[in-house]
């Protein structure tokens, strides 16, 4: 496990379903404990409703205003605010307005961040390719 920051290592990048992912800390660097990435999401964009069965997720909004749907309840989250999305709970979000939003995501345990790189490389789409996802 590499516990020191490595400024010479560039973040891994992936663009999947119109969202740009910049993975700044992955499972390799953390020994599987966490995954950290910054996402740039298009205006009015966001993922379909989904569930993480193994990972807890914390999202901090850096730019824009988001609306999160978490287990049937709507939570507005503005720049500078955070939300916790526990594993096993259906959720989604969308960026409010036409301008892109940026958020920092922390997943624990790590590993799911690699999903975005693989999904982008395979050009998988949701919900069309849900069986492959």
Give the location of each predicted region.
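Basic/polar N-terminal segments that are highly enriched at the extreme N-terminus
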Residues: 1-11
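Ligand-binding loop in jelly-roll beta-barrel domains
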Residues: 79, 87-113
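A short glycine-rich, His/Asp/Glu-containing loop-to-beta-strand
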Residues: 13-49, 55-56
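Acidic/histidine-enriched, glycine/proline-rich intrinsically disordered or flexible terminal extensions
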Residues: 117-133
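Short acidic-glycine-tyrosine-enriched beta hairpin
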Residues: 7, 29, 58, 65, ...
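Short strand-coil-strand connectors
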Residues: 17, 69-71
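Short, charged/polar surface micro-motifs in flexible loops or helix N-caps
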Residues: 29-32, 41-45, 58, 65-67, ...
């Amino acid at each position: 496990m590499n516990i020191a920051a490595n400024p010479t290592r560039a973040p891994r990048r992936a663009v999947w379903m119109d969202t740009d992912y910049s993975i700044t800390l992955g499972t390799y660097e953390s020994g599987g404990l966490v995954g950290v990435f910054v996402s740039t999401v298009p205006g009015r964009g966001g993922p379909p409703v989904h569930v993480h069965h193994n990972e807890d997720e914390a999202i901090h909004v850096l730019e824009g205003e988001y609306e999160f749907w978490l287990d049937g309840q709507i939570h507005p989250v503005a720049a500078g605010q955070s939300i916790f999305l526990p594993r096993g709970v259906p959720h989604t979000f969308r960026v409010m307005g036409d301008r892109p939003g940026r958020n920092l995501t922390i997943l624990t345990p790590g590993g799911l961040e690699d999903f975005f790189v693989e999904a982008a490389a395979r050009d998988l789409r949701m919900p069309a390719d849900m069986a492959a996802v």
